[in-house]
Amino acid sequence: MGHDVITSIVVNYRCASLTFRAVESLLADMPQATIVVVDNSVDSVEAAALRAGLPGQARLVLSPRNIGFGAACNLGIQEGRTDYVMLLNPDARVFRGCLGQLKSALDGDATLGAVSPLQYWDTSRKWMLPPAWLPTGPGMATLEQAWRSGRWASQLSLAYRQHAIAAWTGKEIPVGQRALSGGAMMVRRSALPAGESLFDPSFFMYYEDSDLSLRLRRYGKKLALIGGAAALHEWENAPGKAPLMEASKSIYLEKHFRDLLHWQTRRERLTARRPPLENPLNAQALESGQQFLDVPQPWQGGWLLELSPSPLMIPSIGHLGNGPFAQLPLELLKRFRNCPAYLRLGPVEKTKNSNLLTFVAKTIADRSDAGVSACAE
């Protein structure tokens, strides 16, 4: 397999217009790349739209049924012969130079098994999406404890905050990661044993990238975030997909942490004994229509504003800024789709949770773009 060309794969599910934009960005960044679109829609109208709208150099693969994200990627990989495979969500786009930066990182370090760009939530590149967090059996149990204890919630949330800050500020060098998001990732195929699929098809959606990350690490390969490479991912909150996530989580824990399933028993006992806290970080309600947060004077040289659908602020979207005011991204908050948004403001440097300002705000749904979530990884 050669290194001179990259195979880029986009999985489509009834969102052709988004897929066109994703493919356009890939070709604008690297015209010689091999583009493969795998359509999971099982819909003749969607297939016709893809045939009519995709550029001639893009290969279209029609799946006979909706086989899920990971299996569709595996199907697309069969169309390429390159060692490097770029995976991109249809609701994502790469910025110029992204593919070259990722390829250069893999070229320069044979121990890297996969790399990802820094993903932004907006075209102005102010809001950064969270780095992936590798789930483990003990980690899941700790998360359940955090839902039931303000002290545990504070400690775990701060640990994730520091993890995110390291990823968001390390823009000059590769930042080592324990896991990467499959929504925008370049993988070295030769990092896996011959004959082993990139993704385990047991995962219909969610956790397939966690599974891949864990396997690559067990094969002695490293993972990294390449801050000089950038992508746009128009993520939307999709609470209706929670059952899919729970099903995949069970498969993941059974596969990798079978010997540690006592953590699951501990979780079940904990759940039965104590219900989760509704507001573990004591978030304060924002005033209706509020557009700015006042930044305390000691933080005005550099602050971090985070947004999250979770009261634990895990994971969170971040914006690094300075000055006396932090503006709330009201248009972007519509992507929370009628779910509360939790906000946290604090200095960029490491600090105690008691020093941070945490808020909760009601959001409004943006029905005009409701199709985005159907394509989300």
Model-derived segments and spans:
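A conserved acidic beta->alpha catalytic loop
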Residues: A16, S25, V38-A48, R65
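Short, flexible, basic/aromatic active-site loop/helix in glycosyltransferases
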Residues: L134-Q177
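Short aromatic/hydrophobic "clamp" motif used to bind/position activated sugar donors
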Residues: V85
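Glycine-rich, basic loop-to-helix element that forms the pyrophosphate-binding segment
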Residues: S63-G80
